[in-house]
Amino acid sequence: MRGTHPVGNLWRLTGLLPILFFTLKVWQYAPAGQAAQLVWFCNISNLVLGLAIFALRSDAIFITTALLLIGLPIWLFDVAVQGGFHAFSILTHVVSPALGLYLCRNLGVGRHVPILTIGYYIALQLAARFLTSPADNINVAFDVYVPVKGLFPNFWVYSLANMAGLFVFAVVLRRALK
């Protein structure tokens, strides 16, 4: 760990927030028979963020926060175009990344977090491929995101573009948090 916040171990308790937000999503999806929705980047990242905060693992806090932040515009677009807004999603997409940013700024992050962020992204893509149906296209693990489908010749080019964009975003975010 590169630093500690003056409040010390009390900050670990803030890890309860993202875990609570994940639990609310479980409550939302599981009874409706939509448990696969829990595998989305944002939902898994909330759970992992909470655990990372408990452990005060600044690199893991950064990685999950980066995924939550980069997904924010996509979530806003989906809500605006497709509807389906749920109040719990504000907690996931706004409160958790704000908490993560605050902690990253105060704890610091390692220099390898951009590449680790890509590794996490790939792990969540693989989880979606193994645990969910191609029809759901969770984490766009099976097909190009429909609104941009015409911009990419195939899924693999799209996936590489996503990873490149995420890497650049993680580099810029890391520098901004210094």
Predicted features by range, described:
Residues 18-66:
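Long, hydrophobic N-terminal alpha-helical segment
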Residues 18-27, 68-79, 119-130:
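Aromatic-anchored segments of alpha-helical transmembrane domains
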Residues 27-35, 78-87, 106-107:
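Membrane-interface helix caps and helix-loop-helix hairpins in membrane proteins
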Residues 52-55, 59, 72-82, 102:
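Membrane-helix exit/interface motif
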Residues 114, 134-171:
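Membrane-interface transmembrane-helix boundary segments in multi-pass integral membrane proteins
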